[in-house]
Amino acid sequence: MKIKKRQYLIIPAMGFIFVGAMACSPATDQFSARSAAKGIPAGWSTGGLGMAGVDYDWIARFKDPQLMALVAEAMKRNPDLKATAERVRRAEAVARLSGAEKKPQLNAQVNSLQQKQRFPGFPIKLGSNNAEAYGASLDVNWEPDLWGRLRASQAAAAAESMAFAEDYRSARASLAGQLAKAWFALGEAAEQVILAEAAVGVRVKTVASVQERFAAALEGGLASQLRLAETDLASSRASLALWESERARAIRQLELLIGRFPEGNIPEPHRLPGAPSVPPAGLPSELLKRRPDIIAAERRYEAAGLRRGAARAARYPSFSLTGRSGTSTSAFEDVLDRGFGIWSLAGSVAQPLFAGGRLKEEERIAGHDEVIALQELQGTILRAFAEVEQALVAEEFYARREAAVLESATSARKAAEASILDFADGAVDALTLLAAQDRQVQTAFQLVSLRRMRLENRINLHLALGGDFQTQVLP
């Protein structure tokens, strides 16, 4: 009877320990980018450029069906993006695996034992003793999560999984941005090739005109002017070769980003599109909820804090329950007979006493990891704000520069056209003609490059704002 009384005392005591331990389980801290960010301004420094709203489907803003088709193809074929998607799936599997540790473990077991024992050394021959034993059982093992260690580990794995999902969003946006920039670089090269071909044609005619006047000895000192005209022609041919090379390079860069074999088989755009309207920038505080890199850093900060809690809980006592139910018999045919049934139930409490300082240092390391994650989150937030501010300010300057260069290019074109007529009439010398033509060529090249740079800055602004676009399914 004493044994029974002790059993009745042990069970309530373990229940008391379990309930008390659950009450002592540490609460999980809330980790957010807003709490990590310091001194978020009420608005952007550019004022009017930062309109309210959300930047949806920024690829469609360029109104280029071919670009949209290439982006959609890249989302399906790019191997780097596929690898990032697999990392997301792997992180999700790790999170599910971490959750499995909280559940009871059930194992089926079948055993067989055959034993033979001899009795040597006796005055009479006793022979030997043969014994057989068979059994089947179901074993259950469960470790109740007294201090929240397993719960914190599972939550940390889930937060890490969400961070990888945001990494995928970030990689997806980055790929779209790189592809759009490569597409516009191809558009610039195509336009520059056309301009270079036109410049070669014009300068061939100029060389012929100067050569004609030189042969007729209409002016003194035309030999040097003829050489200058020939120099400009050679320079234009070099520019043409350069831009043809840039066009081929841009095509292969596009194919690489898409995931195609780089064979130079992409139809090039006829010209660069105009810059669309400035996207809505919203409020700086809203950026914390849109940028995938900020959200990923936020989730990693959360995971680090949860792992710190799990490391702290690992220093507390652990409680485990084991149970077995089955049969044990000397005859194999009786293995499934309940009349030979056995069962057992055991509980244990273990308190780490000495581990060479390992548990303490693991908690310290987890604390350092949490501080590192916080600093990385704050750095990500600052970089995000800087990228938006820089893109908004650059947009203002690019708009002013494009207007000024457009005016300059228009004036240079008119001056070159007038100088051709004046040169034919003998009103100006070849130097004036060559200078006017060179100014026209250079301003035309500059205008195309500036338009491409403005489009690239617009892409940077879309990415900095955490803008989204279509075709969001994992490849």
Feature locations, PLM:
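Alpha-solenoid helical repeat architecture
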Residues: 221-225
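Hydrophobic membrane-targeting signal helices
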Residues: 18-23, 202, 349-350
